[in-house]
Amino acid sequence: MAEAGARRPFFRRRKTCPFTGPNAPKIDYKDSKLLMRYVSERGKIVPSRITAVSAKKQRELARAIKRSRFLGLLPYVIR
């Protein structure tokens, strides 16, 4: 039997990957507006545990951000 004052533990709902599904956006190094959502205010790539991006798509995203930086579409550091 459960105690009268015992609470149920809080379970955070697992977020779904924003790049999976039928009408999900395609990760492209030329789409700097989309890529900027996954870069912090200091210019670092935001980890997947915060953005809920799957491991496969996180690797794709990191590759696209790095390509975009190399071509000068995204800054390396934001001041």
Curated annotation (Swiss-Prot):
Keywords annotated in UniProt: Ribonucleoprotein, Ribosomal protein, RNA-binding, rRNA-binding
GO terms of molecular function: small ribosomal subunit rRNA binding; structural constituent of ribosome
Keyword flag Glycoprotein: no
Entry keyword annotation includes RNA-binding: yes
Annotated InterPro entries: Ribosomal_bS18 (IPR001648), Ribosomal_bS18_CS (IPR018275), Ribosomal_bS18_sf (IPR036870)
GO annotations of cellular component type: cytosolic small ribosomal subunit
GO biological process: translation
Subunit structure: Part of the 30S ribosomal subunit. Forms a tight heterodimer with protein bS6.
Family to which the UniProt record says this protein belongs: Belongs to the bacterial ribosomal protein bS18 family.
Primary role: Binds as a heterodimer with protein bS6 to the central domain of the 16S rRNA, where it helps stabilize the platform of the 30S subunit.
Protein name: Small ribosomal subunit protein bS18
Gene assigned in the entry: rpsR
